């Protein structure tokens, strides 16, 4: 049976998972109507792919291995690894929005590897769809990225993903995805390898099974694999022995145990507990290892601590230091971009590839019943030959023209350098190079500045010399000086001073941050104070209390607004901000000592 290996790449929410699900339904791999590829609860909720997924379908006596890749830059190294194991990519582009920054990031990687993409212009049923313009923009993007003449001669398929329809031209009367599947068979080269050569494979992804332990997922580059003794080689040439105890292949979204597999196929193997991404599994100790896979370095770091607030242990099922450590160790088995330093007894230092990367880990933990607190995220600073280096990002922004001045001014203050600006209809596309510090906590402000109409995407560039101090608009914190239930009367007086994070009847404790002040100074407040009652009759009827809706705290929003003397307290049902030192007098004394 012939094998085709493809990946699906696209910007967040351009429809790649929807198309994959439709392909699986129409080839009979799954029957239910629900979204199947984004299996993680968070992925379904946010509508984004976080982990690359493997699936296989059978069509016209051909096995097609499909990898659904993440579209967010925080998960970029997932994408890069996957591209090494496939022969073509389906580039899914929204017919209205055209190619977006994340598309650019993944596409550049695939063109550099010599892959010839098939372009799928999706969502052609949108009222504002512009499929021809989107196709032109894709061609221009290919040119920009230095595509070869052969790569520029790409095949285009038009699609309505949610209805499961694909067309070779816009006026085709197609009712299903047959045109797309036929195009894959015609244009994607069949997987080739030498079946008689000694076996070699390189894992591009890791999985975990409670019974089998760490699982390695990869493509067999050559030879045939069976259970038994193997050698594992690091890219440096270091060799150790291992043993394959079980092997699986993918059928639909389920895995099927097999006894052997040949070159070109994608398999999952169990039995090598310390296997890592980029290592080569081979039959002979003197075989050449496959080229190393580069994994993006972490750019931000923060501390995970046991929750010690007055409300600790109320909601969480797993609250101890040991339980948090075990959960982080389990995460390290599969989350390659994550690094954890367990050397300090008081906290665990967790480093990741961006705010979203870490926020998703914390969100998953709280849903599983964990309770913890985290410190303010900090950018990782390196030192090389006596110079401080910090991570820089390329930020691409699409905004209506009237907001461009504000964005340029704001990012200028945050040490951003504009490298490109071009009008696109009523929108302007701007590209900046900016220190990661400059965009930590900026997304929320960006949505306010563009009234929700802007699109913001970033990707890691490199470590560069430290850009110096960054001026940000400082807000102070309103910290409760008492414990109890917040009253509407008190909150109504406080809301004039800034933005509140809590509503009436919320339980608070001393040192809990209940809002921020427009001025830069912290303020100790009493949110439980009621109205003084007297036996005097008031001269007029009491005015009704009107509370402005408060700002709901999420993990990402907490990252944006927290100060360096605060913790974000995360429990299964609540996200709260608190001062590290809860008592106001002790806080003031500590502040004086610092000064």
Residue ranges: model-predicted function:
Residues 1-93, 97-99, 137, 206-209:
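P-loop NTPase switch module centered on the Walker A-proximal segment
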Residues 200-302, 312-314, 475, 484-534, ...:
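Conserved nucleotide-binding/hydrolysis modules and their immediate coupling elements
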Residues 222-224, 272-274, 352-358, 400-404, ...:
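Helix N-cap motif at beta-to-alpha junctions
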Residues 160, 344-357:
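Short glycine/threonine-rich beta-strand-turn micro-motifs
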Residues 116, 126-189:
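Canonical P-loop GTPase G-domain recognition
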Residues 83, 89-151:
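Conserved C-terminal guanine-recognition region of P-loop GTPase G domains, centered on the G4
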């Amino acid at each position: 049976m012939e094998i085709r290996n493809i990946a699906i790449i696209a910007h967040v929410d351009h429809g790649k998972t929807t198309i994959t699900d439709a392909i699986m339904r129409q080839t009979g791999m799954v029957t239910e109507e629900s979204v199947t590829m984004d299996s993680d609860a968070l992925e379904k909720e946010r509508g984004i792919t976080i982990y690359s997924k493997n699936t296989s379908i059978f069509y016209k006596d051909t096995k097609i291995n499909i990898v659904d890749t993440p579209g967010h830059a925080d998960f970029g190294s997932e994408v890069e690894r996957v591209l090494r194991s496939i022969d073509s990519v389906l580039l899914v582009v929204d017919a209205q929005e055209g190619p977006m920054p994340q598309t650019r990031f993944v596409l550049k990687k695939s063109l550099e590897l010599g892959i010839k993409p098939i372009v799928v212009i999706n969502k052609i049923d949108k009222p504002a769809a512009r499929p021809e313009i989107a196709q032109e923009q894709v061609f221009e993007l290919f040119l920009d990225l230095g595509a070869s003449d052969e790569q520029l001669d790409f095949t285009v398929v038009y699609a309505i993903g949610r209805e499961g329809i694909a067309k070779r031209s816009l006026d085709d009367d197609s009712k299903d995805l047959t045109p797309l599947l036929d195009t894959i068979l015609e244009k994607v080269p069949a997987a080739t390898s030498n079946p008689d050569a000694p076996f070699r494979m390189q894992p591009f992804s890791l999985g975990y099974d409670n019974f089998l332990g760490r699982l390695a997922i990869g493509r067999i580059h050559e030879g045939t694999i069976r259970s038994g003794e193997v050698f594992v080689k690091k890219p440096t040439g270091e060799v150790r022995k291992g043993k394959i105890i079980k092997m699986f292949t993918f059928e639909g979204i389920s895995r099927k145990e097999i006894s052997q597999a040949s070159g070109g196929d994608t398999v999952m193997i169990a039995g090598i507990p310390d296997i890592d991404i980029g290592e080569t599994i081979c039959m002979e100790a003197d075989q050449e290892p496959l080229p190393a896979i580069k994994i993006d370095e972490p750019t931000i770091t923060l501390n995970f601590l046991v929750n010690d607030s007055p409300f600790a242990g109320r909601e969480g099922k797993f609250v101890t230091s040991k339980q948090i450590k075990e959960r982080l160790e389990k995460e390290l088995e599969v989350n390659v971009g994550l690094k954890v330093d367990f050397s300090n007894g008081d906290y665990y230092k967790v480093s990741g590839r961006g705010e979203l990367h870490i926020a998703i880990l914390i969100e998953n933990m709280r849903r599983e019943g964990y309770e913890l607190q985290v410190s303010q995220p900090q950018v990782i600073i390196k030192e090389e030959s006596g110079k401080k280096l910090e991570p820089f990002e390329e930020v691409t922004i699409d905004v209506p023209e009237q907001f461009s001045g504000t964005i340029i001014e704001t990012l200028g203050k945050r040490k951003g350098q504009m490298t490109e600006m071009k009008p696109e209809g009523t929108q302007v596309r701007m590209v900046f190079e900016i220190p990661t510090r400059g965009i930590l906590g900026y997304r929320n402000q960006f949505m306010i500045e563009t009234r929700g109409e802007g699109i913001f995407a970033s990707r890691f560039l490199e470590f560069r010399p430290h850009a110096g101090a960054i001026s940000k608009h400082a807000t102070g914190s309103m910290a409760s000086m008492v414990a109890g239930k917040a009253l509407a009367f008190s909150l109504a007086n406080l809301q004039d001073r800034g933005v509140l994070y809590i509503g009436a009847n919320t339980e608070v404790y001393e040192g809990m941050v209940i809002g921020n002040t427009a001025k830069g100074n912290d303020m100790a407040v009493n949110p439980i104070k009621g109205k003084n009652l007297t036996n005097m009759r008031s001269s007029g009827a009491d005015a009704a209390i009107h509370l402005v809706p408060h700002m709901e705290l999420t993990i990402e929003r907490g990252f944006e607004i927290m100060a360096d003397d605060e913790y974000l307290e995360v429990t299964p049902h609540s996200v709260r901000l608190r001062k590290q030192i809860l008592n106001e007098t002790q806080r003031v004394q500590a502040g004086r000592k610092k000064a």
